A protein has these predicted regions:
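Multi-pass alpha-helical transporter architecture, strongest
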Residues: 195-217
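Intracellular juxtamembrane helix-capping segments at the cytosolic ends
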Residues: 139-153
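Extracytoplasmic gate region of multi-pass secondary transporters
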Residues: 32-86
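Helix-to-loop junctions at the C-terminal end of transmembrane segments
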Residues: 85-98
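Structural signature of the two symmetry-related core transmembrane helices
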Residues: 101-116
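Juxtamembrane intracellular "pre-TM" segments in multi-pass secondary transporters
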Residues: 5-39
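A late C-terminal transmembrane helix in Major Facilitator Superfamily
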Residues: 152-197
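Hydrophobic core of transmembrane alpha-helices in multi-pass small-molecule transporters
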Residues: 125-139
Length: 217
C-alpha cells in the first residue's frame, strides 16, 4: 500500500508539472518574433524574384535582340542551373549552424545576374548571367524552405513558421510580376524593372542575413 501511495503521489506531481509547463509554451506567439518576420520577408522576396524571372525573362531577352526560341532556351538553362543547386544548398545548410555565407552567395549571384542583364547584352555573357540567376535562385529557395526547421525547436513551431511565411510570402510574391509589368509599360523598357529587382534582391539579402542567424523563434 505504501508503495502504491508513493507511486500515486509521484504521478500526481508529474501531472501538475506538465500542466504548468504546457500553457507557458502556448503563450509564445510566432507573429511577435522578429526572426519569424525576417524568414517571412526572405521567403516572400525570393519567391517574388523567381516569379518575375519566369514571367518576364523571355520578354527582356527578346527586347535585347534574341529570338523567342533563344529566349525560351535561356529560361530552360536557368532552371537547369537552379534544380541541382537546391539539393546542394540543402546539404550545406543542414551542416552549418549559421547560413550567412550561403545567403550571401545566393543573393550576390542574383544581383550580379541582374546587373549583367542590365549592362552587358552579348549572347555568351547572357548565358553566364542566366546561370548565375539559376544558381542564386536555387540557393535562396532552398534556404527559405530550410529556415522553417533550422530556426525552430520542434515540429509545432516549424509548422507555425511555415504557415506564416508561406501565406504572407506567396501573397507578397504574387504582386511581383504585375508590378514589374506595370513598370515596363510605364517606362517602355526593362531598365527600371531590372534596377528595381536589384533593389529587391538587396533587401532579400538583408532579411536573409537576419534569418540565417543561429537563433530560434
Amino acid at each position: 500500500m505504501a508503495v502504491d501511495n508513493m507511486a500515486a503521489d509521484t504521478l500526481e506531481e508529474v501531472n501538475k508539472t506538465n500542466n504548468i509547463d504546457e500553457p507557458t509554451m502556448k503563450e509564445v506567439s510566432i507573429w511577435k518574433s522578429s526572426l519569424a518576420w525576417q524568414v517571412t520577408i526572405y521567403m516572400g522576396l525570393q519567391s517574388m524574384i523567381f516569379y518575375c524571372i519566369v514571367t518576364w525573362l523571355p520578354s527582356i531577352l527578346i527586347q535585347q535582340g534574341m529570338t523567342s526560341s533563344q529566349a525560351g532556351w535561356m529560361l530552360s538553362i536557368m532552371q537547369l542551373a537552379l534544380i541541382p543547386t537546391i539539393f546542394f544548398c540543402s546539404i550545406l545548410a543542414g551542416h552549418t549552424s549559421s547560413q550567412h555565407s550561403l545567403v550571401m552567395v545566393g543573393s550576390l549571384c542574383i544581383i550580379i545576374g541582374f546587373l549583367g542583364l542590365l549592362l552587358v547584352h552579348s549572347f555568351k555573357s547572357t548565358i553566364l548571367w542566366i546561370i548565375l540567376l539559376g544558381i542564386g535562385g536555387g540557393f535562396t529557395f532552398s534556404l527559405s524552405m530550410m529556415f522553417f526547421n533550422l530556426r525552430t525547436n520542434n515540429a509545432n513551431e516549424a509548422a507555425r513558421l511555415s504557415g506564416m511565411a508561406q501565406s504572407i510570402g506567396y501573397l507578397l510574391a504574387a504582386f511581383g510580376p504585375m508590378f514589374f509589368g506595370y513598370l515596363h509599360d510605364a517606362t517602355n523598357n526593362w531598365t527600371m524593372p531590372l534596377i528595381t529587382l536589384i533593389g529587391v534582391s538587396s533587401v532579400c539579402l538583408l532579411s536573409g542575413l537576419g534569418a540565417s542567424r543561429n537563433l530560434s523563434v
